[in-house]
Every structure is written in structure tokens, then in C-alpha cells.
């Protein structure tokens, strides 16, 4: 039920490098569509629903709010509904000085997130961090920045989502998994971007090695590998 539009947020060619936002070019808008479609889809999966009912068991600790109050079972369920409820978002591209900017209806991310999100370990931290600002969470919660538990486990919303993405991507259970479909990172599309591509994302083999490394480190992957969902047919 999200209503999404795009904006330059006042950017013009004359504003200078210190401006908070960059031009919202079509190539970035297309990636936003992929990002939002995958994110919304993740929220409908059996794995998502299971983790939200068993968060501490799967992820090693609970989510907590701006007052550092851990979520109750009821809070997990009510937030599940709130996150997918009707809301307006204005999407943009932020300055490289930030990973992103978000709050209210504004949801902006920086250039590397537009091509990094396919790799799971890159992109989703900023994407979901800013989403949670739109959902009224601040930096005192672990909804924007994950935080270490006393046992040393990094727990938070951003950790959950990149791990869910890497699990579903490996299964082929996401609407969009192929970064070559739009080819944002490809040299022939450089003329349509206003950014360079980080070295790690320029070679498919190198990128896959990094994805595999993060896959092996994921608590969520380990949990569902050892405890497959009975109603999960894929």
C-alpha cells in the first residue's frame, strides 16, 4: 500500500557539491522500483513472518525502540502491519557525503546503494536504515543501526533484512535477483549515471566470492538451513 514518487529535492546543476541531494535520473528511478519491489516482497515471505514471531531465537537478540524497550510479541506483530500500511514515500538520491537521508515521507539513498543492493551485504543497511527513519525510529533504537548484544551478536533491523535478502536471493525467491537486467553497473550505462562503480562490483566472480562469504556468516541462513520451514516449498 505504499504510494511512491520521485524527486530531486531541490537539486539543480548549480547547487554545488555540498547539497544534500543529487539528480534523480531515470537509471536511479528504475533501481528504486527493483529495491521497493524486492523489499515489499520480502515482507510477504514465510521466512519474514517466522522471524518476526521468533526474532530472538533466529537473530540472537530482540529489536528495541527509541527508548531501548525490547519488542514484545504484540509489538512485532503490530509493526509488521504498520510497515506495510498505506504510506507516501518520496524517493531520491542523496549526496555521497551520506549513506542516505530519511524521515517523514523522504526516503533517499546514496549512489552505491543503487547497484549494491543485489549483493545483499551492500545497500540494504542504508535502504532499511532510512526506511526506519520514515517509520519514526531514531539512532537510539536498533531499527536504524544494529547493536551488539552482551553476547557479542550484532542485532537489528538492518542485519535482519540483508540476511533475509541473501537467503531469498540464493533460493531464487525474489522478484529481481539479476543485476544485469537493468545493468546499472555496466560501462555502457556510465553516461546515464553520475557516479563511478566500486571495484568490488565490477567483476562478477569477485562479487560472488564476497556474497558467498557473507552467506556463510549469516545467522538467518544457518537457522533456516538447519530448521527448514515445513510450508516453504522452494
Model-assigned labels for residue ranges:
Residues 1-124, 134-234:
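Predominantly extracellular/secreted Zn2+-dependent metalloproteases
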Residues 130:
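Walker B catalytic acidic pair
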Amino acid at each position: 500500500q505504499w504510494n511512491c514518487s520521485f524527486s530531486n529535492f531541490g537539486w539543480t546543476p548549480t547547487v554545488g557539491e555540498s547539497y544534500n541531494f543529487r539528480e534523480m535520473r531515470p537509471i536511479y528511478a528504475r533501481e528504486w522500483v527493483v529495491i521497493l519491489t524486492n523489499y515489499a516482497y520480502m515482507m510477504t515471505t514465510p521466512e519474514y513472518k517466522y522471524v518476526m514471531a521468533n526474532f530472538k531465537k533466529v537473530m540472537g537478540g530482540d529489536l528495541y525502540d527509541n527508548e531501548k524497550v525490547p519488542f514484545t510479541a504484540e509489538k512485532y506483530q503490530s509493526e509488521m502491519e504498520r510497515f506495510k500500511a498505506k504510506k507516501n514515500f518520496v524517493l531520491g538520491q542523496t549526496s555521497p557525503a551520506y549513506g542516505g537521508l530519511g524521515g517523514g515521507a523522504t526516503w533517499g539513498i546514496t549512489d552505491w546503494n543503487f547497484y549494491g543492493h543485489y549483493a545483499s551485504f551492500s545497500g540494504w543497511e542504508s535502504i532499511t536504515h532510512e526506511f526506519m527513519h520514515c517509520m519514526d525510529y531514531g539512532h537510539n533504537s536498533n531499527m536504524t543501526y544494529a547493536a551488539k548484544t552482551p553476547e557479542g551478536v550484532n542485532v537489528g533491523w538492518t542485519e535482519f533484512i540483508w540476511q533475509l535478502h541473501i537467503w531469498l536471493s540464493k533460493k531464487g525467491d525474489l522478484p529481481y535477483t539479476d543485476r544485469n537486467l537493468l545493468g546499472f553497473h555496466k560501462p555502457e550505462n556510465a553516461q546515464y549515471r553520475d557516479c563511478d562503480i566500486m571495484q568490488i562490483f565490477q567483476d562478477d566472480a569477485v562479487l560472488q566470492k564476497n556474497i558467498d562469504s557473507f552467506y556463510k556468516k549469516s545467522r538467518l541462513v544457518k537457522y533456516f538451513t538447519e530448521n527448514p520451514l515445513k510450508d516453504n516449498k522452494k
